[in-house]
Curated annotation (Swiss-Prot):
InterPro entries: ATP_synth_F0_asu (IPR000568), ATP_synth_F0_asu_AS (IPR023011), ATP_synth_F0_asu_bact/mt (IPR045083), F0_ATP_A_sf (IPR035908)
Function statement: Subunit a, of the mitochondrial membrane ATP synthase complex (F(1)F(0) ATP synthase or Complex V) that produces ATP from ADP in the presence of a proton gradient across the membrane which is generated by electron transport complexes of the respiratory chain. ATP synthase complex consist of a soluble F(1) head domain - the catalytic core - and a membrane F(1) domain - the membrane proton channel. These two domains are linked by a central stalk rotating inside the F(1) region and a stationary peripheral stalk.
Superkingdom classification of source: Eukaryota
Catalyses which reaction(s): H(+)(in) = H(+)(out)
Keyword hit for RNA-binding: no
UniProt keyword Ligase present: no
Record GO terms (molecular function): proton channel activity; proton-transporting ATP synthase activity, rotational mechanism
Organism: Bos mutus grunniens (Wild yak)
Name recorded for this polypeptide: ATP synthase F(0) complex subunit a
Listed GO biological process terms: proton motive force-driven ATP synthesis; proton transmembrane transport
Keywords: ATP synthesis, CF(0), Hydrogen ion transport, Ion transport, Membrane, Mitochondrion, Mitochondrion inner membrane, Transmembrane, Transmembrane helix, Transport
Transmembrane segments: 6-26, 68-88, 97-117, 138-158, 164-184, 200-222
Amino acid sequence: MNENLFASFITPMILGLPLVTLIVLFPSLLFPTSDRLVNNRFVTLQQWMLQLVSKQMMSIHNPKGQTWTLMLMSLILFIGSTNLLGLLPHSFTPTTQLSMNLGMAISLWAGAVITGFRNKTKTSLAHFLPQGTPTPLIPMLVIIETISLFIQPMALAVRLTANITAGHLLIHLIGGATLALMSISATTALITFIILILLTILEFAVAMIQAYVFTLLVSLYLHDNT
């Protein structure tokens, strides 16, 4: 457990050496580039996954919307790598901070909405009032649709923050329980350690899935406004 509420903001150190450089360079190690004519298996797998994700996300977009491909692929790589930072010992996950996620979500959401009002003003305004709405319900539905529109960035940020934070808290708690049980019951400690390993593997999957979900929702917002 942390000694105080501010312990997580202290620069992580090992043998008196700061780990900031290692933490900053860690994401780049996950996405190596090959200078050979024939790529190795890891680079080939990386390119295949990026092409698969790109194909799934951009299949719903028209030719004009295809221009967002580079931005969306950069976004999913950025979120995925920052999510994985928390699994590096003595490091900190930036995406557990609601302020960062909210700033990122609001910027992307606002860009999509402004693009929609600029390019398709009538269509964007029509989203506030579904077709065939009874006249007495028009004011209420306009208010509801407006609220739902402004809740979208909050939902994006809270979803990412909650899922990443919950996984890291579970790893922290089970890791502490494993250390406490080592002096009490070796068998129970071994079982808890196995659970910790499985949970860590699951957290790797959650980190990538949450990056995919965040980027997919941004892609859908862009699709509705382009």
